[in-house]
Amino acid sequence: MRATIPFPDMSPEIFSISVFGFDLALRWYALAYIVGIVLGWRLVLRAVKRPDLWRDDQPVMTAAQIEDLLTWVIVGVILGGRLGYVFFYQPGYYLQNPSEILAVWQGGMAFHGGLLGVIAAGFIYTWRHRIARLSAADIMALGVPPGLLLGRIANFINAELWGRATDMPWGVAFPGAAAQDCAGVEGICARHPSQLYEAGLEGLILGALLIWLVWKKAALKTPGYVAGVFFAGYGVSRFFVEFFRQPDAQFITDGNPLGLAWHINGWGLTMGQCLSLPMILLGIWLIARARHAA
């Protein structure tokens, strides 16, 4: 097995400065979060400023409400993403070390947890302001793919969340002892750049599909449809990529080398697949409901 693509020599930090003895660094991952949120916010604002895209030419939210909701979304992403990682992937460790649960600067965020955080934030906000929830879910879903695209690219730059070992010509030799520890492989180990697979499927393709549905097919006139396509599209994309993505180390044992979170007689699902199945089912239900209501 050989790597045909060497990992690019890039630092996770864009730059670092020292202020009063404290080192402050801007990392690609943080920049991806910031730019992704801003791009999603601008995309949503464009949609709410187009009354013709909405049922009865009435956007469900004003531009001011979108900006207000953005604060709730940011809090939901950070808290949900962190708590999702803690309880979905390493509950035992963090229950023994509760002081590290909120140490987000040490790394460890989960998309499914962040999604639950955003859903909770959106539910509370729409309840307080008496906003139609399905239409609000549509507009929130529209703003997610830019963050997914940039976030997964940042994962690649950070050389984290890499894929399983492969002999395909686009395999990448990620740095680090863990990335190069491949069972049965001598010499350099090439891995699937699964972060880029996710960036393309969940970010670029899914984002383009949602934009096409909103601006070309007036999908916002059918509440719940855009959100349904997002849930189903992300769920299917993530479920597929999990076949190529290296599972978290805590799930891998001698009797479970594939790192399956649930398995019977060698067959099973990774944690990412287990969490994606409910998304697929919810997405299908929302799409069917929206079509029936139309």
From Swiss-Prot:
Pfam families with a match to the protein in the record: LGT
Q: Tell me the gene name.
A: lgt
Residue positions binding a 1,2-diacyl-sn-glycero-3-phospho-(1'-sn-glycerol)? 152
Locations listed in the record: Cell inner membrane
Q: Which InterPro entries match?
A: Lgt
Q: What name goes with this protein?
A: Phosphatidylglycerol--prolipoprotein diacylglyceryl transferase
A GO molecular function for this record? phosphatidylglycerol-prolipoprotein diacylglyceryl transferase activity
Q: Membrane topology type, per the record?
A: Multi-pass membrane protein
Pathway where it operates: Protein modification; lipoprotein biosynthesis (diacylglyceryl transfer)
| GO aspect biological process, one term | lipoprotein biosynthetic process
A GO CC term assigned to this protein in UniProt: plasma membrane
> Where primarily located?
membrane
Q: Which family does it belong to?
A: Belongs to the Lgt family.
In the UniProt record, does the keyword Transmembrane occur? yes
Q: Which PROSITE patterns match?
A: LGT
Q: Which UniProt keywords apply?
A: Cell inner membrane, Cell membrane, Membrane, Transferase, Transmembrane, Transmembrane helix
Looking at the UniProt entry, the stretches that span the membrane are: 19-39, 69-89, 101-121, 139-159, 195-215, 224-244, 267-287
Q: What is its EC number?
A: 2.5.1.145
Per the entry, what this protein does is: Catalyzes the transfer of the diacylglyceryl group from phosphatidylglycerol to the sulfhydryl group of the N-terminal cysteine of a prolipoprotein, the first step in the formation of mature lipoproteins.
UniProt organism field: Roseobacter denitrificans (strain ATCC 33942 / OCh 114) (Erythrobacter sp. (strain OCh 114))
